[in-house]
């Protein structure tokens, strides 16, 4: 239920629509019991070919480190490469192409120490070989018993899910869920019916705990370069300080959830057409999260090594790369010291447990009366109320310094113990009424009124009225339409308007609360506590109002093609946002209040075709398409294009228009005393030193920081010059002030006294434009369902037509942090680069015909040369085959002999095919950010794609009914 009128009786929880789910009930066939079993076994594999850079990544990092000097001492994080070792890396890939991925780390073959004591990695490692299983398995079973006896029907169902995770080295990486449900309905007599239900669900998630922070193993899989060893053991049998070994040795964390729901209800029918319903539901959720720490002991490959002696005799290893490093045919054997790299009391030297319990009481009461005035006039009256009370309590405990990491217990830890707790509650209540009028099945009218209250607002502002109305006209039921029914089988037009209250905000926005903290000074032998000054609050916070107007049409052609179309406009008024107009001298953050508003315009289309052919083939086709655009209509006095200014399109992305990559011909050159070609340096309009550009090429010095802005080189991006002070290109790429120019308001003397923040007269953004939008646009799907002589086929596609994303991670930005080394293959293989020989004289590898700019190291984020531009935007549009199911139901004449009512076998595939425009990046187009993973925006530093890869699954199942 999407429009405000139809969703209104559900109150505040329906602010963004309602999905109605009807629980299974017992069979309506008298004195009959059906037993149904459904089970499947599933295999999960990678959803697409994930490729991280190997040799091409080494090439990129080296090229990025030698942009200016042409050679480098070394580049990398803990494990290095330079112009000397690079040829050895290249040769290794051919010489040891068949080396098993788990071959131990071997000195002289996989790495060597150079004359400066740096670990030069020659062997390359594919993280997916070490971290991801070739396949994981799951099983799902469901059993239900449904039946009836007399006026009573019942349904009992049981379910079990067992799903393995994807981490190859983990001791335990899995998820299990058990659930049970029972529902009973009985009609006592014509006056009274009663019902009851009980639901229970238990789930357990186990995973390797590699860190107590918001980072997990994938953060380091997608961080270090391909020559950083992630093989689990070295040649001496020591575990290595690698992601693989840490996951293997990590303690097993567990997350458990128990959900119980019990409901009872009754329906009283005093007279015909009058029903009175009472329902009560109690739901309780308990959760536990246990994190046992561990101590990591093994070869610390991050840091230095020592010479290896046996009985006092120095051992030597064969140096397979002497032709390149010149260190000799044999070199002193190196061995990493076996050490504990877990910091005492650090991230994994602790034990943690949290528990929470949440209760929800839901009360519903409605009465409905149907009044048939005559054959053409029908009226339905409904009155009702609903109330919800919610309360939750939580507790966490943590203690550091484990005495025995193999037996993590609070009583066996000796460090600091920390405890904390939480308690929250809220409640809502509402009263509503609805009147439906139906004239001759042609004209339909509905009116609703709600009176809602919420504990989240001050006493005087808790309660609000919310009305809604709708009307429909079944045009096809008019007498004059009869002749058209051969073509237009049915036609209905409708409209609705309504207002629903939204209270999806925190519980204490209007209450000034003081936070307690521990002081750092000691008094009377103990640390003092102190309370901070409360934040400023607005005492008049109340409901956010969501008003929706909807116009729709439903029609059917030839009794087989059904079309539904809706256009809607949804306005969120009194939106709770920070207060406007407070100066810096206010002293604290502006309090939030009902100061904002936004507006969404959208439409939805669904087309369905269904037909039964003479040969018994049943075919059903369904396609959907929807789009919506949201605009900020009121948000204080912000004038920054990066902020929430009035008139901003939600999700808009500002940046430059990419023209092409710079070439030698775009610069003015000269030669130095030795005859080497060098740039001519000049000054721009603001007296900044820049490399002189050829005639007609815009300068881009303003995009770099500092006074020396001459760093633009061949292979760097050239942006389009689209703006100047007179409105025409001016030969310089500039950023402007980044502000919105609102219409000024003048006094009688012509002085600006204020601004009209509803009228935008322009933008001071230099050569930037809106280059994309992060909001999903043109969401679509289509489904094919077919059935023929026991065979059934279901195909479901889903996609997004347009969506953009700005990259902010190793996997989404070329050169994000190339000194660490990790990057996707597509970035490394398709970037502009030059690699010189050890002397820095001759180019030994290059890629001038590239898609991405010159290899550079951004040091952890895009900036300067690779600022926001339309060439770097990720195209997140996609088409995915979400499900393909093929089944066969055996003929009853065969199964009934075994007392089987129905036997169906099927094959089902999820995420079987994905078509996207991500150029081979190892991220999933449906995962826009990683905030969802643990409900925390800082998970893995909010880096896109830094998590377990997406999988496809293939399942084989059976459905049995006795």
Regions inferred by a protein language model and the residue ranges of each:
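Membrane-proximal, glycine/serine-rich, low-complexity loop/turn segments characteristic
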Residues: 6-269, 277, 378-379, 504-520, ...
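Short Pro/Gly-enriched beta-strand edge/turn motifs at strand-loop
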Residues: 121-128, 417, 762-766
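Extracellular/periplasmic, surface-exposed regions of secreted and cell-surface proteins
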Residues: 183-192, 198-202, 239-293, 303-333, ...
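C-terminal or late-domain output modules
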Residues: 166, 175, 390-425, 796, ...
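Extended amphipathic secondary-structure runs
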Residues: 133-153, 266, 352-388, 749-796, ...
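Short, glycine/acidic-rich beta->alpha junctions
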Residues: 1-4, 13-17, 137, 174-177, ...
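Conserved small-residue
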Residues: 36-117, 612-770, 814-815, 825, ...
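Extracytoplasmic gating/loop element in the C-terminal half of outer-membrane beta-barrel translocons
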Residues: 62, 299-302, 307-318, 324, ...
């Amino acid at each position: 239920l999407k429009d405000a009128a139809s969703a209104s009786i559900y109150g505040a929880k329906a602010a963004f629509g309602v999905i109605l789910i009807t629980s299974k009930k017992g069979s309506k066939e008298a004195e009959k019991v059906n037993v149904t079993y459904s089970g499947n076994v599933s295999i999960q594999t990678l959803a697409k070919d994930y490729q991280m850079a190997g040799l091409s990544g080494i090439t990129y990092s080296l090229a990025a480190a030698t942009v200016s000097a042409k050679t480098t001492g070394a580049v990398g994080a803990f494990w290095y490469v330079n112009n000397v070792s690079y040829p050895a890396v290249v040769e290794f890939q051919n010489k040891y192409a068949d080396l098993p991925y788990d071959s131990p780390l071997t000195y002289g073959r996989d790495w060597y120490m150079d004359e400066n004591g740096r670990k030069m990695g020659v062997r390359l490692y594919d993280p997916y070989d070490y971290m991801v299983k070739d396949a994981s398995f799951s099983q799902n079973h469901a059993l239900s018993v449904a039946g009836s006896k007399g006026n009573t029907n019942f349904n009992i169902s049981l379910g079990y899910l067992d799903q393995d995770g994807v981490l190859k080295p983990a001791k335990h990486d899995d998820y299990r869920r058990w659930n049970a449900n029972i529902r009973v309905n009985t009609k006592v007599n014509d006056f009274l019916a009663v019902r009851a239900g009980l639901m229970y669900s238990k789930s357990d998630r186990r995973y390797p705990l590699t860190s107590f922070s918001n980072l997990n193993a994938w953060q380091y899989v997608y961080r270090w370069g391909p020559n950083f060893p992630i093989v689990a053991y070295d040649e001496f049998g020591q575990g290595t300080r690698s992601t693989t070994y840490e996951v293997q040795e990590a303690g097993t964390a567990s997350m458990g959830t128990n959900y119980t729901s019990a409901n009872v209800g009754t329906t009283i029918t005093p007279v015909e057409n009058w029903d009175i319903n009472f329902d009560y539901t109690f739901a309780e959720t308990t959760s536990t999260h246990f994190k046992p720490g561990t101590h990591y002991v093994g070869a610390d490959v991050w840091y230095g090594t020592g010479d290896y002696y046996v009985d006092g005799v120095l051992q030597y290893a064969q140096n397979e790369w002497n032709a390149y490093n010149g260190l000799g045919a044999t070199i002193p054997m190196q061995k990493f010291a076996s050490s504990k790299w877990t910091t005492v009391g650090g991230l994994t030297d602790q034990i943690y447990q949290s528990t929470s319990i949440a209760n929800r009481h839901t009360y519903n009461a409605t009465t409905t009366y149907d009044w048939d005035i005559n054959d053409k006039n029908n009226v339905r009256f409904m009155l009702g109320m609903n109330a919800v009370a919610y309360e939750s309590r939580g507790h966490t405990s943590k203690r550091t310094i484990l005495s025995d990491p193999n037996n993590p217990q609070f009583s066996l830890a000796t460090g600091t113990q920390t405890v904390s707790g939480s308690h929250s509650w809220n409640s809502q209540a509402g009263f509503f009424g609805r009147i439906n009028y139906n004239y001759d099945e042609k004209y339909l009218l509905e009116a609703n009124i709600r009176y809602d209250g919420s504990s989240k607002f001050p006493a005087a502002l808790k309660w609000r009225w919310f009305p809604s109305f709708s009307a429909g006209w079944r045009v096809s039921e008019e007498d004059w339409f009869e002749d058209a029914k051969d073509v237009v089988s049915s036609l209905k037009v409708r409209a609705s308007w309504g207002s629903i209250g939204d209270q999806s905000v925190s519980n204490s926005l209007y209450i000034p609360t003081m936070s307690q903290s521990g002081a750092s000074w000691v008094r009377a032998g103990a640390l003092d506590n102190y309370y901070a000054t409360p934040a400023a609050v607005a005492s008049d916070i109340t409901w956010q109002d969501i008003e929706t107007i909807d116009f729709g049409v439903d029609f059917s052609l030839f009794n087989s093609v059904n079309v539904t179309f809706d256009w809607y406009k949804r306005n969120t008024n009194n939106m709770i946002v920070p207060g406007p107009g407070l100066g810096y001298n206010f002293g604290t953050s502006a309090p939030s209040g009902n100061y904002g508003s936004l507006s969404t315009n959208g439409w939805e289309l669904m087309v369905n075709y269904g037909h039964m052919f003479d040969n018994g083939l049943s075919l059903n086709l369904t396609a959907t398409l929807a789009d919506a655009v949201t605009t900020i209509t009121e948000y204080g006095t912000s004038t920054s294009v990066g902020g929430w200014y009035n008139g901003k399109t939600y999700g808009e992305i500002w940046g430059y228009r990419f023209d092409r990559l710079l070439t030698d011909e775009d610069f003015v050159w000269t030669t130095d005393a030795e005859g080497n070609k060098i740039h001519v340096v000049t000054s721009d309009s603001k007296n900044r030193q820049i490399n002189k550009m050829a005639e007609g090429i815009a300068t881009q010095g303003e995009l770099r920081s500092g006074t020396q802005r001459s760093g633009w080189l061949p292979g760097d991006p050239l942006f389009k010059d689209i703006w100047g002070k007179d409105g025409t290109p001016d030969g310089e790429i500039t950023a402007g002030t980044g502000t919105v120019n609102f219409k000024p308001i003048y006094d009688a003397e012509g002085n600006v006294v204020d601004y009209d923040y509803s009228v935008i007269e322009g933008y001071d953004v230099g050569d930037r434009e809106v280059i994309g939008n992060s909001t999903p646009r043109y969401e679509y799907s289509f489904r094919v369902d077919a059935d023929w002589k026991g065979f059934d086929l279901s195909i479901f596609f889903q996609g997004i037509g347009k969506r953009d994303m700005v990259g902010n991670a190793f996997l989404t930005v070329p050169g994000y942090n190339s000194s660490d080394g990790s990057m996707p293959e597509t970035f490394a293989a398709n970037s502009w680069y030059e690699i010189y020989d050890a002397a820095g004289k001759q180019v030994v590898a290059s890629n001038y015909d590239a898609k991405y700019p010159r290899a550079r190291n951004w040091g952890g984020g895009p900036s300067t040369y690779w600022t926001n531009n339309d060439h770097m935007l990720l195209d997140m549009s996609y088409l995915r085959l979400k499900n393909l199911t093929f089944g066969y139901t055996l003929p009853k004449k065969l199964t009934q002999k075994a007392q089987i009512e129905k036997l169906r076998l099927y094959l089902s595939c999820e995420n079987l095919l994905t078509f996207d425009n991500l150029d081979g990046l190892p991220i999933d187009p449906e995962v826009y950010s990683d905030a969802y993973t643990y409900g925390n925006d800082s998970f893995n530093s909010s880096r896109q794609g830094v998590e377990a890869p997406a999988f496809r699954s293939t399942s084989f199942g059976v459905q049995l009914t006795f």
